[in-house]
Regions:
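Post-transcriptional modification and biogenesis factors for structured RNAs
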Residues: 1-165
Length: 165
């Protein structure tokens, strides 16, 4: 049994969090939201982006980053940042991995990154551009981990509605 955890630190845009919620629901990843959030959980954009998957989502809320770390002391943490020295696909993700992402407008605190430099990873992109969208970054990261784990508990084949393969 593999446990994959997605951590959003102070997310600001409800549509991003809704999209990420949907990604977590369809992959079985647990979502951790660290407050303060830039929106209300009842936000219509958040709900719409997550579609009707909210009842399939395992989600936890934390009052602060300190609260999160106190309640999850035994995780294997990977910090996704444009400032990372390591490429995300070159890391080995063990069971109980936590993929940690910062605010859309500011990323993760630099003191946190500095203290955990060996676990800071970057999704490669052009240097002259600032960053990828948060929900896209999470999807890239989640599927890299799941690829390394050989897609546990995920359907590998789809079905046509009118025809058979």
């Amino acid at each position: 049994m593999h446990n994959l955890n997605i951590v959003l630190v102070e997310p600001q845009i409800p549509q991003n969090t809704g999209n990420i919620s949907r990604t977590c629901a369809v992959t079985g990843a647990k979502l951790h939201l660290v407050k303060p959030l830039g929106f209300e959980i009842s936000d219509k954009h958040l709900k719409r982006a997550g579609l009707d998957y909210w009842d399939k989502l395992d989600i936890s809320y934390y009052d602060s980053l300190d609260d999160f770390f106190e309640k999850n002391p035994d995780g294997n943490f990977f910090y996704f940042t444009t400032k990372g020295k390591n490429v995300h696909s070159e890391a080995d993700y063990p069971d109980n991995s936590y993929l940690v992402f910062g605010r859309e407008d500011a990323g993760l605190p630099e003191d946190l990154l500095y203290r955990n430099s060996g676990n800071c990873v970057r999704i490669p992109m052009r240097n002259e551009l600032r960053s990828l969208n948060l929900s896209n970054s999470v999807a890239i990261a989640v599927y890299e981990v799941l690829r390394q784990w050989d897609y546990p508990d995920l359907a590998r084949e789809g079905k046509l509605t009118k025809y058979k393969w």
